[in-house]
Design a protein with these regions (language model features):
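N-terminal catalytic cores of secreted or lumenal carbohydrate-active enzymes
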Residues: 2-134
Length: 134
């Protein structure tokens, strides 16, 4: 996967009318299938290859995670782990990019399956320890 630099000089809030394609959010459903190379490959082919829907936009969800002490989230697909965690040994916040390996597996497969990939990144919430509800 190539790194794309974000331009801070273009202050436009639109893409100036350029159509970039079709896509889907990778939130939740890929968390459920990304453990399996077979399911990951099949999903990438069905959604992003020319043999399937030929989508090209992937919306990657950076999960906020949930307080490990809470047990209110029952659906395994919606438990998207966050990258940021507090390391008690170093007393610092650190990133663990492998925490969300299921979604990353599907993202890579989808990226490789399409000819003109666009990746958008979003988050539905901050890390749990940055909220009052926790």
């Amino acid at each position: 996967m190539k790194t794309i630099k974000i331009s801070y000089t273009n202050k436009s809030i639109t893409n100036n009318g350029n159509f970039q394609g079709w896509g889907t959010s990778l939130c939740w459903w890929v968390n459920r299938i990304g453990y399996s190379p077979v399911l990951t490959k099949k999903a990438a082919e069905l959604f992003y290859s020319e043999k399937g829907l030929n989508l090209n936009i992937m919306r990657y969800n950076i999960g906020g995670g949930d307080n490990p002490k809470h047990k209110h989230i029952k659906r395994t697909d919606s438990m998207v782990p966050g990258w940021l965690y507090f390391n008690k040994e170093t007393n610092e916040y650190q990133y663990d990019y492998s925490a969300d390996i299921n979604q990353l597996n599907v993202l890579k497969a989808c990226y490789d399956a399409t000819k003109h990939p666009y990746v958008e990144v979003f988050s539905n919430s901050p890390p749990y320890f940055m909220t009052k509800s926790g």
